Amino acid sequence: MMLSKVVLLALLLSLSCLWVAKASEQRTRVSEVVREAEIHDGGQCTDDDICNKNCLDCIARQCIFQQCVCSKRFFPPNSQPNLRVKKH
């Protein structure tokens, strides 16, 4: 009985370690994408349509905190991320 509890505890511990490692890997990917984003010189916006008109050289663009944020990096169509501004 005690052995089965120890085995179950070890199994749960190993699964939680795998889950933490997977979450950490995803966080690294997101931070790489955020580093690729830049605030466009075009300036302020009220919605994404304004950024689409002003940031023609960008591949992905969004209006965040009333600033056009764009990425010149190519993302496959199914994995295009939501862009965020990283505070320094």
From Swiss-Prot:
Gene Ontology cellular-component annotations? extracellular region
Signal sequence span is 1-23
Biological processes, Gene Ontology terms: defense response to fungus; killing of cells of another organism
Q: Where in the cell is it found?
A: Secreted
Q: Which cysteines are joined by disulfide bonds?
A: 45-63, 51-68, 55-70
Q: Which UniProt keywords apply?
A: Antimicrobial, Disulfide bond, Fungicide, Plant defense, Secreted, Signal
Q: What is its main location?
A: secreted
Family, per entry? Belongs to the DEFL family.
Protein name in UniProt: Defensin-like protein 267
